[in-house]
Amino acid sequence: MKKIKSFSLLLVIAGGLFLAACNQTGSKKTQSSYFESVDSGLQTGGIKMIPIKTAKGTFKVWTKRFGNNPKMKVLLLNGGPGATHEYFECFENFLPKEGIEFIYYDQLGCGNSDNPQDTTMWDLARYVEEVEQVRVALNLNADNFYVLGHSWGGILAMDYAVKYQKNLKGLIISNMMASAPDYSKYAADVLSKQLKPDVLAEIRALEAKKDFANPRYMELLMPNFYAEHILRLPVENWPEPVNRSFAKMNQSLYVTMQGPSEFGLSGKLEKWDRMEDLKKLSVPTLVIGAKHDTMDPAHMEKMSKQVKNGSYLFCENGSHMSMYDDQQTYFTGLIKFVKGVNEGQKKVKL
């Protein structure tokens, strides 16, 4: 009897080891498939320079594919305007292990892409057409194409979706309101009043003189505003990818589109408003807001209800860069949304 029990126990152990080995093999196979090359010829690590046709000539933009999934491909649109893809590098710690492919992309005038140094090209409608050309070049379509726009990238993503939602599988609007006037009002009525009165007075004095290049302006903003509402860490502890990206900011592009002040929009985007147009969107949409953001989280929750198939992710501990200061909430929700849409859900419950 003891021999039979021992033999049965050995069978159970052997079976467990066999299943574990199968799971490891399956995991390795999935990982191998995710990172395998889909290109022929010379290998470039997933980098592709894409020619962009404009009224001013043809320029090249830089893209880099990370991973390989024929059904889930997320194109990342950086903020600024004028920053680079580099602050998205934290995505490498979360999306690959879930089998989600993502694509870095420096918009024209940013990072590794061409910089025409022509302010007439810093135009929202032109950038929408640029994204469409990138989509075509990368063979993205409604079967696999998710676009994630963060901050200014969210503006670009919304305008792209309004015109080209037929090409999208999913839309992610991260930390961006749908109305520039509403954002400016929130900055004036809420954000500025959270500053110490003497700090705000000095900032306003510099802005009144249009002395934005004065080092004192950033000395005031960094600890009192940026570390509270952009990324909630002491500035000296900000992640290297964020610092690297912001150090390469195209100031011409930023000021032309956003304006020089951090409290509202005064550039070309000053009157931009898509709140009503969101009602036209039926593509599954995730809106991400954060408690300490420069953007009004209540407004962003409303955005998720304006679209026909919207989900809202609230980052309780996050700010404008909530992919860093509330990472677990941000990426858990993002991954659940992308996978849910891939499984056929129109409105993903988070």
Task: List each model region and its residues.
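Conserved hydrolase catalytic core segment
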Residues: 143-186
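C-terminal motif of bacterial Sec signal peptides marking the signal peptidase cleavage site
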Residues: 18-21
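Active-site loop/oxyanion-hole signature of alpha/beta-hydrolase fold enzymes
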Residues: 107-148, 152
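Catalytic active-site module of serine/aspartate enzymes centered on a nucleophile-bearing elbow/loop
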Residues: 310-350
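Conserved loop-alpha-helix segment in the C-terminal half of the alpha/beta-hydrolase fold
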Residues: 275-317
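Conserved HGGG/HGGXW glycine-rich cap/lid loop of the alpha/beta-hydrolase fold
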Residues: 59-115
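Alpha/beta-hydrolase
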Residues: 194, 201-279, 283
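Flexible "cap/lid" loop of the alpha/beta hydrolase fold
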Residues: 171-212
